[in-house]
Amino acid sequence: MTYPVIRELPPEMRPRERMLKEGAGSLTEIDLLAIMLRTGTSKVSVLELAAELFSHFKDLRALSQATIEELSQIKGVGPVKAVQVKAALELGRRLAAMPAETRVIIRCPEDVCGLVMEDLRDLDREHFLALLLNTKNQVLARETISIGTLNSSVVHPRELFKVAIRRSAASMILVHNHPSGDPTPSREDIVLTKRLIEAGEIIGIDVLDHIIIGDNKFTSLKSKGLI
């Protein structure tokens, strides 16, 4: 198979540009390796060079086990490119060797309260947070979406779901504090929550609940039947 020279490809078809636009998951192994190699030679495009490496070593595992000397023997690679490839593969190996992170599982509103109460109960301004969850209701991240005033916070669906998409969240639980200490939801709280639930349904990220934190007490809008 013949691969084109990168500069001859339309911008939207080039590996680096595609990765910036669509993410690494959209690229083939040859595309990713071409990005690592950066350039080809005067006779071979970087995509052809990447394909030649995979052809020689058969698969990613064999490529990762190759020594710098073995990589350097491929025409067009050389020691500099061999080191670049080996360094990137070593990072991947170390990541795979890391112990699995122990993540908190959210089973009920009390679990949420236990995570955020001490941080939010005494704040003098409203902080709007999202707990981003995976498909097993494990917490992937806790993100502060906005910081408002004494009695209000402005939350744009765009900003909320941009964070959730970036973290590959399957669902989320919304949290914000009432500096007054009273966790009773306002009409605005309920309207905003319903709006965010609707946005989540369109995007495919479920908003499971909205917890309001007061002074050592909280309200779950879902438990109260308000959403």
From Swiss-Prot:
Per its UniProt record, what CDD domains does this chain match?
MPN_DUF2466
Q: Which organism is it from?
A: Desulforamulus reducens (strain ATCC BAA-1160 / DSM 100696 / MI-1)
Q: Where is the MPN domain?
A: 105-227
| InterPro entries xref list | MPN, RadC_JAB, RuvA_2-like, UPF0758, UPF0758_CS, UPF0758_N
Give the location of motif JAMM motif in residue numbers: 176-189
GO MF term list = metal ion binding; metallopeptidase activity
Q: Which family does it belong to?
A: Belongs to the UPF0758 family.
Keyword set, alphabetical order: Hydrolase, Metal-binding, Metalloprotease, Protease, Zinc
**Where is Zn(2+) bound in this sequence?**
176, 178, 189
This one is known as: UPF0758 protein Dred_2549
Query: What superkingdom heads the lineage?
Result: Bacteria
Q: One GO biological process from the UniProt record? A: proteolysis
- Organism placement in taxonomy: Bacteria, Bacillati, Bacillota, Clostridia, Eubacteriales
Against PROSITE patterns, the record matches this protein to: MPN, UPF0758
